[in-house]
């Protein structure tokens, strides 16, 4: 019988057999090799899973759009919470304020001063309707949002509403950005670190003055105001 090297294999002497009881022969050697091979593959088996584990952990720190790990799922859910809250707060300003039909005396008083117009919901509604025709309704919306903010007392709500107002009307990236001078913007930017309900007071005053000097005179000569005044005058005559 030849060895694996091709040479003749020495016969095992009776005295050597007790010393080599554990050496496998024939099919036993083949079986042991198979076990070693299987055992090697089993020991190497966990490596891909560990590598995969490292991949999933690394995935948590990437920003690829294909990532579906649970870490980013939680992060996405957290990112959506303020968006939902922002949407709920944004609906606080209705498209039109609830108000009774103004009287002829009220509408005539709007022509006497801008304050008389802005103090009543009906006056603000009519003015907003006019501002829409000039594509400048954001001025009134900003002013109204500031009025709401000043009525808030809860700190977290104040911070959230201040952030929304900033994003909607102060940010240069917003399509509804209002016209403010650089000094007022700088003050707002500094105070956004810890906003109060009066953070936009200077900006609100600037926009109020802008509407008073620029939009209000045109409103008084607009069809929106004149048609409302005429309809109320006719109803008064009929009565």
UniProtKB/Swiss-Prot annotation:
Domain RGS: 113-229
Keyword Mitochondrion appears in the UniProt entry: no
UniProt keywords, alphabetically: Cytoplasm, Glycoprotein, Lipoprotein, Membrane, Nucleus, Palmitate, Phosphoprotein, Signal transduction inhibitor, Ubl conjugation
Signal peptide: none
Post-translational modifications reported in the UniProt record: Fatty acylated. Heavily palmitoylated in the cysteine string motif. N- and O-glycosylated in synapsomal membranes.
Coiled coil: none
Cellular localisation: Membrane; Nucleus; Cytoplasm
Topology in membrane: Lipid-anchor
Annotated spans, Disordered: 1-29
GO biological process, one term: negative regulation of signal transduction
PANTHER family: REGULATOR OF G PROTEIN SIGNALING, REGULATOR OF G-PROTEIN SIGNALING 20
Name of the protein this chain belongs to: Regulator of G-protein signaling 20
UniProt organism field: Mus musculus
Lineage: Eukaryota, Metazoa, Chordata, Craniata, Vertebrata
